């Protein structure tokens, strides 16, 4: 019976893309199955109310919206997504509003960047990455962020991002200029 319980909760997790919240659990019995699966190590508790199937965590992309609601992939994670840098991010880079407080799980590693609300209102798009709907800075905004945070990320990374962007055929220099002006005034 216990093996069947574990299998049922794993099936539910797989249907949900590897992640589940206690709010999505339909009954006390399912909650107990989830708790037992976490105790057995089949499922990992990321933080209070959020669980993930261990194999889902092996993927290099995470369901950012579940772990950091309203978070936006940025900087190194965006550089990697757009192929602007050869740097491999050691953690998922997520921007949130400066006044927010977020409790992060031990795993997966996430670096939070606290941005002013005005910074979160432009240059943000939604993409389906590895099966997850993720909000991410668009490519022009990503390049502007590289320049803005050049002292934090390093001039070598900033230069690599700019060079890679300028080699792209689909670049939009006028949008890049518009974003640069917006970031100057924030």
Spans of features found by a protein language model:
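Short beta-edge/loop segments at beta->alpha junctions of small alpha/beta modules
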Residues: 1-73
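Extended, low-hydrophobicity, polar/charged segments
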Residues: 38, 56, 66-69, 101, ...
């Amino acid at each position: 019976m216990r093996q069947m319980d574990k299998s049922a909760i794993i099936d539910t997790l797989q249907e949900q893309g590897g992640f589940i919240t206690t709010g999505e659990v339909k009954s006390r019995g399912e909650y107990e199955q989830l708790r037992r699966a976490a105790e057995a190590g089949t499922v990992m508790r990321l933080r209070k109310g959020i669980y993930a199937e261990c194999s889902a965590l092996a993927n290099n992309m995470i369901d950012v919206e579940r772990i950091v609601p309203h978070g936006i992939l940025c900087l190194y994670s965006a550089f990697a997504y757009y192929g602007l840098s050869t740097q491999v991010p050691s953690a998922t880079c997520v921007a949130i509003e400066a006044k927010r407080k977020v409790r992060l799980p031990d795993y997966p590693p996430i670096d939070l960047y606290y941005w002013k609300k005005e910074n979160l209102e432009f240059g943000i798009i939604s993409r389906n990455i590895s099966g997850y709907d993720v909000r991410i800075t668009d490519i022009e905004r990503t390049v502007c962020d590289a320049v803005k945070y050049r002292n934090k990320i390093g001039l070598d990374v900033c230069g690599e991002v700019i060079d890679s962007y300028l080699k792209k055929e689909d670049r939009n220099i006028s949008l890049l200029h518009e974003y640069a002006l917006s970031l100057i005034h924030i």
